[in-house]
Amino acid sequence: LVPVDAKAVEEKVAELSPKNFPIVGIGARVKGAISYCGTDSAAMEKLVKEELKRLSDSKKVANYCYFYTNSTAISPSEKQLFTPVSRDEIESVRKLAEPAETYSVSSYSEYAKEHEIDIMRRDNYGEIFLNPRLLANMVPIKDDPDRVFAFCLGSLPQLDMYLSGGQLDSCVYDDWYGWGYFAMRTLAEKVVEKRDPSKKEELLKPLIATPKNVDSFRKDWARWLR
């Protein structure tokens, strides 16, 4: 369901449930669904916290966070809807980062081009992308010796280029394949085996990709896109 608000589909779920049309919520809890699968928020927060500490080498780094928005007219309360990452995850990472500044942009490359001088003035800083769509156009991130690290929350196939080239140091993302596997297994139990799901809820650990294990990242996307 991410990034759809669960409330937007609950009316339809309520309509279908009496008609023996079972629904599993993935990425968001849905009222009326027979079960739910998502990411363990505590595990996500722990992993991101460890990564930010590792990437900064435990030094004080000025973090700059980027939200994704596809419209300059969108309100701050709505800007986080345009993401394959949940709002709870975004807010959790933003708090952990304790950003010096936050920006809402449609493309990091466009922002970097327009604010090249501002970026050059930064010292000892980290960049945190709170949506992989910020890097979807595959424009390389300009090298900067003052940039300590670049981190992304969420995943798209395009990030392979950034990870392989060392432009992105770390990416933490949801196990979408695991979500789908749980959902299909649950539906098979309900529809084929005619029994209630063995699990009402399944929380999976987040995945992590770095330049060192980028092959694993590619394999994840290869099986997701089959």
Predicted features, each with a name:
Residues 1-18, 92, 100-162:
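Hydrophobic alpha-helical
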Residues 6-43, 156-164, 168:
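Flexible loop/hinge segments that line or gate small-molecule binding clefts
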Residues 14-21, 50-57, 139-140, 164, ...:
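Sec-exported extracytoplasmic/periplasmic mature domains
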Residues 24, 149-151, 209:
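Structural detector of well-ordered beta-strand residues that form the stable sheet scaffold
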Residues 31-39, 69-72, 124-125, 170-173:
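Second-shell loop/turn segments in exported
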Residues 36-63, 76-77, 155-160, 174-195:
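Hydrophobic alpha-helical segments within soluble ligand-binding/sensing domains
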Residues 44-51, 72-100, 179, 224:
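Short, solvent-exposed amphipathic alpha-helices that sit
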Residues 175-226:
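Hinge/cleft segment of the Venus flytrap/periplasmic-binding protein
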